[in-house]
Amino acid sequence: MKLRTSFFNFRVLLKNITRFAPLWILYAVGEVLGLMSLDLENEAAQIANDLCCLMGPVSVFHLVYALLVAACLFGDLFDGRLCNGLHAMPLHREGWLLTNIASGLVFALIPALAGGGVAALFLEKYWWIALVWQGTSLLQFVFFFGLAVFCAMCAGKRLGMVAMYGILNFLSMLILWVVTRLYEPLLPGVVISEFWFAKLCPVLSLFGSDYLDYTYDKILGGIFRGFIGESLRYLVICAGAGVVFLLLAWLLYRKRPLEKAGDFVAFRPMGAVFLLSYTFILGVLLYTFGDLLGSYRDYGFLAVGMLIGWFTGWMLLERTVKVFTKKVLLGLVAFLVFFVGSLGLTLVDPLGIVTYIPKTEEIASASMYLENDIHNYDSDSGWDGWYITDPEEIAWVQELHQTMMHTPQSAGNMEGKNYRAHQLMYKLGNLDMSGQEYITVYVQYRLKNGMEVYRTYRIPVQSQAMEGLKTFFSDPRAVFAVTDYQKMKENIRDVTLYWGIEDEMILYSDAQQQELMAAIEADCEAGTMGQHAFFHGDDDYVADIDINWNAVYKMGQMGDISGIRGDYVIVYKDCINTVAYLEDLLEE
């Protein structure tokens, strides 16, 4: 008579719960103690706020806990005798797998219930936040556990499982690291955006997520405005990905050869993924170390690191040191040809990425700003960059961009047309720029189709491009870090002049204030008022001008709030109109 297939075995579940009780008990106790470490003497609204702030960071603990749970439950697959003995028992593979998956979920449910139950005792009317805590914890665990089970099916030993778990969790950031270290320097000015790489790394995204729009106020108490849909959607997608990994693990387990127990990987394709990842990681690690030493050593260390990674990776996969065979050497040659070819193709840039400048009619707005400017480019100061929409001013940005693109960013007498080769010379030789100082310029275009283009350039202070930059950043909007200069000028409250060590003068008269602003505007028009120190000589400082004006701050949902905003302007010797006005003022 044909035996009925069972997809679940309750006895195995109970055995797992008792066999690995120390693991889930310790985690449950740790979660309870962690929640008890909060200041429970605070009022319930404050405790609720603390709990909301922990929902994202606690994902790191689920990352490790899920790996430990999967390693314990599926550890029998990594030992030859245990693996063969297990599969000789009258228990179907599907039944054993699904029972272990259910055991893992129980191992997550018990700590979540314990921690949430303890938290609910102190949350009073905010008890429902404990339920949100439990839900987010379980969904985070489902993703990491699903990935860990998938890695367990792909690996033949625990070390291989841990290696693949780490690589897959941080794969996008590892790719970003390799690209920014090896390929980005060959594309002068190009900046690889981290946004999508971070989005594809759940460890980072879950860690920084807030799931509730909840704030605490000492007077109003807890203020709940709703759930943060974007974070919850991302969490649900991750949990869904965890379920997909569990399904893939089930498909792999049905085909898993028992003789692979003890091998580094159980399936050959995963061996290729591990070998390439391991080789690149080790190569870039040594490359980074060599880059610190300089003088041609970075690429030498890269080659050594890749050689070590390739052969030691094969040793792990083959479980032998006898890997110096024709097959392995031919694979190494093919890998190096592909790698060097990709570097050469990046350097040649057949797609014209380096020289790409959007057309004026494609641009919605453009922005250009400097690193280490005296102004604070953030929303708190009311200034989040100078976004230009006027077509003529956008064309000005494009012209400066074109000039910077063809300005050598290293020492020497290379012509602009050879700037890309010159970049490689600088990278290979790690030259010291002949002692020149550099200014970092950021260019950003927001296109009408929603895309954004970023470029970053390191411009020598002595280059011709500095003159154009100095003129551009002498615009009053850049000098005072405001988007509406005329409105700022009309609302000035007071002006204070500082020079020397203790000398100062306050201008109370509207006439004096407007005369000073007229002198500053004249220097802005002349292109000499740029505020970055590299636009002027080392000994050109004359005075500071501290200006306060009435401003309106946009506070989002709280509306607009009136207040006072201040900024200061540095006067240098080449600001001849402002210097002349200050001299006349001091003589009066």
Task: Tell what function each PLM region has.
Residues 40-50, 174-266, 284-303, 354-360:
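Terminal transmembrane helical anchor/hairpin motif
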Residues 39, 52-55, 59, 102-161, ...:
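Secretory targeting signals
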Residues 73-106, 509-527:
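Helix-loop-helix units of permease transmembrane domains in multi-pass membrane transporters
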Residues 1-80, 245-258, 270, 282-296, ...:
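Hydrophobic alpha-helical transmembrane segments
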